[in-house]
């Protein structure tokens, strides 16, 4: 391993300047005042199985991507293509782990690059014609005065045929490169020209593929470093990326360059929630059903809901009972009022009857009532003073000495019975006759006089 690393390092000493083909910056804080860098401020695993992962968190800076079972596909389909993405966020020290499979093809370079605005850089690079090794490299502030930084390390298996996890773990004290679970390289701060060339400012994450063996865009040295000229009749050449787990070791919303030194101590962390972190939270929060929302509520909240629901039911029951009892009370009051009205009407009728009785009006006779009691009521006295004695009480009948008349001569006539053939009146010794007839009269002229 040491032999291979040293041999490849010797070659890289000459060729490494051309490795920077995909590195660039839009504003260099060492030379001008630049906008603050938007922070990631958290950790997240970006799974490249849909375009939304790229569009939400990355910019496609060259070419285009497709997506399949093996993740995002960075494909060179013809000469001059170099599909590349760059994160919309920065990390200020952190860890980046990419699960990927490098592209095949002589001269084709697959890369994982961390790059800052002042051209601090940490690299993983894979050459399509090399199926045994991967290159590690770094730069500080774009310094290319020496080319002794790249070191190649063997991979557990062919990096163009198998997926591996390639990791960069970066702090203010050192940089580590890992393949799967094996640490292959460590760069200490002091080992980079006492920190002057040590990568130490906020960085974006860049993933891409390009043709170092394209003679139209590269020098002969770059072509040799890439393993030779690319044969574009053998396209497509594809790098596959399943995921990138990124952790920002700083927390904040932005990173501010306070001077032009490029020293990590001059970077100010602006507090707050980053835009990217808020987007992650929004996108990763699942839409829950009502049942799931209920299941996720704390027990105290559920208890409060139960109590509130019970109170609501109790209130409804109370309202129902109140309405029922009030209506029942109203019905009882109405019934009592009706009964009082009927009782009053009866009392008024009785009062009127008694007034008529006292006045002897309407057939009432106080003298008759005194001797006969209630039998004097009910119509008996209604004939008094009228001269009417019924159909059998005509003058001719009285003159002919009919039994009815004869009976009437000895006492009052029965209102229902007519005596015939000498039958006796129902009045007997048990029912004494009145001492004075209720009325008397003569057939002469049909007038009635007392006997």
UniProtKB/Swiss-Prot annotation:
Protein name, per record: Crh-like protein 2
Catalytic activity: Random endo-hydrolysis of N-acetyl-beta-D-glucosaminide (1->4)-beta-linkages in chitin and chitodextrins
Gene Ontology CC annotation, any one: membrane
Gene that encodes the chain: crh2
Functional note: Dual chitinase/transglycosylase that plays a role in cell wall architecture. Chitinase and transglycosylase activities are coupled. Required for the polysaccharide cross-linking at the septa and the cell wall. More specifically, transfers chitin to 1,6-beta-glucan in the cell wall.
Record localization: Membrane
Classification via SUPFAM superfamilies: Concanavalin A-like lectins/glucanases
Species per Swiss-Prot/TrEMBL record: Botryotinia fuckeliana (strain B05.10)
InterPro entries in UniProt: ConA-like_dom_sf, GH16, Glycosyl_Hydrlase_16
Species classification: Eukaryota, Fungi, Dikarya, Ascomycota, Pezizomycotina
Residues bound to chitin: 125, 206, 210, 222
Disulfide bonds: 27-34
């Amino acid at each position: 391993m040491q032999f291979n690393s040293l041999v490849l390092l010797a070659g890289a000493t000459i060729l490494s300047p051309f490795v920077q083909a995909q590195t660039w910056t839009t504003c260099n804080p060492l030379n001008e005042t630049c906008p603050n860098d938007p922070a990631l401020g958290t950790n997240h695993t970006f799974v490249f199985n849909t375009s939304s992962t790229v569009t939400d968190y990355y910019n496609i800076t060259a070419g285009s991507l497709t997506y399949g079972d093996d993740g995002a596909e960075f494909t060179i389909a013809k000469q001059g293509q170099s599909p590349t993405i760059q994160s919309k966020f920065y990390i200020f020290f952190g860890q980046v782990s990419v699960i990927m499979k490098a592209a095949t093809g002589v001269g084709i370079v697959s890369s994982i690059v961390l790059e800052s605005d002042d051209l601090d850089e940490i690299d993983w690079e894979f050459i399509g014609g090399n199926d045994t090794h991967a290159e590690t490299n770094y730069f500080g502030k774009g310094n290319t005065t020496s080319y002794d930084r790249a070191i190649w390390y063997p991979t557990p298996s062919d990096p163009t045929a198998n997926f591996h996890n390639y990791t960069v773990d970066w702090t203010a004290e050192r940089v580590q490169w890992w393949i799967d679970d094996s640490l292959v390289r460590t760069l200490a701060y002091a080992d980079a020209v006492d920190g002057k060339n040590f990568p130490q400012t906020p960085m974006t994450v860049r993933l891409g593929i390009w043709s170092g063996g394209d003679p139209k865009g590269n020098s002969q040295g770059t072509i040799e470093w890439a393993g030779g000229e690319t044969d574009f009749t053998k396209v497509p050449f594809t790098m596959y990326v399943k995921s990138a787990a990124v952790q920002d070791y700083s927390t904040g919303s932005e990173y501010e360059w306070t001077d032009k030194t490029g020293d990590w101590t001059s970077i100010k962390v602006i507090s707050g929630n980053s835009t990217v972190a808020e987007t992650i939270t929004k996108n990763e929060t699942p839409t829950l059903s009502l049942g799931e929302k209920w299941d996720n509520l704390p027990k105290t909240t559920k208890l409060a809901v139960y109590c509130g629901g019970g109170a609501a039911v109790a209130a409804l029951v109370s309202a129902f009972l109140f309405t029922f009892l009030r209506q029942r009370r109203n019905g009882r009051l109405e019934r009592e009022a009706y009964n009082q009205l009927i009782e009053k009407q009866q009392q008024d009728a009785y009062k009127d009857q008694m007034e008529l009785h006292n006045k002897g009006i309407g057939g009432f006779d106080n003298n008759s009532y005194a001797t006969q009691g209630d039998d004097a009521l009910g119509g008996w006295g209604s004939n008094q003073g009228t001269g009417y004695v019924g159909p059998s009480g005509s003058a001719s009948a009285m003159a002919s000495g009919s039994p009815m008349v004869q009976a009437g001569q000895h006492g009052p006539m029965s209102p229902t019975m007519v005596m015939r053939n000498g039958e006796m009146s129902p009045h007997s010794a048990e029912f004494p006759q009145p001492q004075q007839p209720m009325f008397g009269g003569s057939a002469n002229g049909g007038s009635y006089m007392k006997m």
